[in-house]
Curated annotation (Swiss-Prot):
Domain of life: Bacteria
GO CC term, one of those recorded: ribonucleoprotein complex
Phylogenetic lineage: Bacteria, Bacillati, Bacillota, Clostridia, Eubacteriales
Protein's recorded name: Large ribosomal subunit protein bL36
NCBIfam families in the record: rpmJ_bact (TIGR01022)
Organism: Desulfitobacterium hafniense (strain Y51)
Amino acid sequence: MKVRPSVKKICEKCKVIKRHGKVMVICENPKHKQRQG
């Protein structure tokens, strides 16, 4: 899980979603998981 000020899709399979008011990227590739912090 990377925590960064701006989250972006890295590949085609990345999805930008909102959970508990936080913007997150979920993906099949665990390295692509990101959370806005």
